[in-house]
A protein has these predicted regions:
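Hydrophobic core of transmembrane alpha-helices in multi-pass small-molecule transporters
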Residues: 35-52, 260-274
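C-terminal ends and interior cores of transmembrane alpha-helices
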Residues: 17-32, 244-257, 340
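Intracellular juxtamembrane helix-capping segments at the cytosolic ends
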Residues: 51-65, 273-288
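Glycine-rich segments within core transmembrane alpha-helices of 12-TM secondary carriers
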Residues: 68-104, 296-308
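Helix-to-loop junctions at the C-terminal end of transmembrane segments
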Residues: 1-8, 95, 222-235, 316
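Extracytoplasmic gate region of multi-pass secondary transporters
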Residues: 87-88, 92-96, 163-213
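C-terminal transmembrane helical hairpin of 12-TM major facilitator-type secondary transporters
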Residues: 233-279
Length: 363
């Protein structure tokens, strides 16, 4: 509804300014020291990020030839992964820094209050800097707000967007995003404990946690490479291949031990790389002016990251960590089925256009 009312560029400005406000809300949150105030600031920040996701994904898909939309979106998502890989370290340096070495045990009265004040100042300075950068970016986007020719459309009931789920291809794609995010977060959540197991790598907690960077870093590298691959191969075929690879890697990891078991599960991050942008673009094909509505529904589907990990944890409690990998494996099986569906749809469309088969409406 926001995009219908304001257009893509102005909606992007709203998203950036919402993120800026969220960052600034960390100032009173750090001063109060109350957890609920941090949650409020985080909620506002996350709302702005969601607006940017809803706006940016269909916008990037539309800026160029439809045939290369998958590649463009994958390339853009690579920078998302770059931030995910780098900024935890940057944040640790900026926010934790020397504070991580301070032991609060035994501190009371003025000494403890002074430490808390110092912690608040560190948080304030970090988030003020981020807010300034976001505000500057919002100003730049605002200056170029009229560079993109947009046709404003009447604002419709937000619930009308769910009518898009009547399209089998779009509904299947939204389910694919749900499964993908759930599987990715599930593996990322259990990987540290998985690598600590005696029959895997038997690593101490810190070393196992450090290996987690390779899992998320694999997604970054894979997206840069995937942007090139998607210009040369059919997106549905590439998605089919990486989903099958993820299934194979999880199976090998669960059935093996030692270095092979640990390495293959980490490598699933590489297989994850092109899944989100490719599923998104395959599901959104043909939506036209309703692309922003579809983007909103797909962004809602990332709730899989909150639902599937607890199911994976339950499976681990009932069996073992190795047994719990069946949950993400089943998720990737669903993604593989979506890729197969899209592949068949493309082949039927090509035959229809060449006059070798009757028209079939699958999307």
């Amino acid at each position: 509804m926001l995009v219908q009312r304001l257009g893509y560029m102005r909606s992007a400005v709203v998203g950036l300014l919402t993120m800026t406000a969220g960052c600034l809300l960390f100032l009173p949150a750090s001063t109060s020291g109350l957890f609920v105030t941090f949650l409020g600031a985080l909620f506002v920040l996350a709302s702005g990020i969601t607006i940017i996701q809803v706006v940016a994904n269909p916008l990037i898909s539309a800026l160029g030839e439809p045939a290369t939309a998958h590649s463009r979106l994958t390339f853009a998502q690579a920078f998302n992964s770059l931030g995910t890989t780098l900024f935890p370290y940057v944040g640790a340096i900026l926010i934790l820094g020397t504070l991580a070495t301070v032991n609060e045990t035994g501190l009371t009265g003025e000494a403890l209050a002074a430490l808390r004040a110092q912690e608040a100042r560190v948080i304030d300075h970090t988030y003020v800097g981020i807010a300034a950068a976001l505000g500057l970016l919002a100003a730049v986007v605002w200056l170029f707000r009229n560079r993109l020719a947009e046709t404003r459309r009447p604002v419709t009931n937000p619930l009308a967007s769910f009518a898009l789920l009547a399209r089998p291809r779009f509904a299947f794609g939204a389910l694919g995003i749900f499964l993908y995010v759930g599987a990715e977060v599930s593996i990322g959540s259990l990987l540290t404990n998985y690598l600590m197991q005696a029959d895997t790598l038997a690593l101490p907690a810190q070393a196992a946690g450090e290996r987690l960077a390779f899992y998320w870093g694999g997604a970054m590298v894979g997206r840069f490479v995937g942007a090139w691959l998607l210009r040369r191969f059919r997106p549905a075929n590439v998605l089919l291949t990486v989903a099958g690879s993820a299934i194979g890697l999880i199976a090998i990891s669960a059935l093996s031990t030692g270095l092979v078991s640990g390495t293959t599960l980490i490598m699933v991050g590489l297989a994850n790389s092109i899944m989100f942008p490719t599923i998104f673009s395959l599901a959104s094909e043909g939506l036209g002016h309703r692309a922003a509505e579809g983007s909103g529904i797909i962004c809602m589907a990332i709730v899989g990251g909150a639902i599937i990990p607890p199911l994976t944890g339950l499976a681990a409690d009932l069996t073992t960590l190795r047994g719990a990998t069946i949950v993400p494996l089943l998720c990737y099986t669903g993604i593989m089925a979506f890729a197969r569906y899209c592949r068949v749809h493309v082949l039927l469309s090509e035959r229809t256009e060449s006059g070798n088969a009757p028209a079939t409406e699958l999307a």
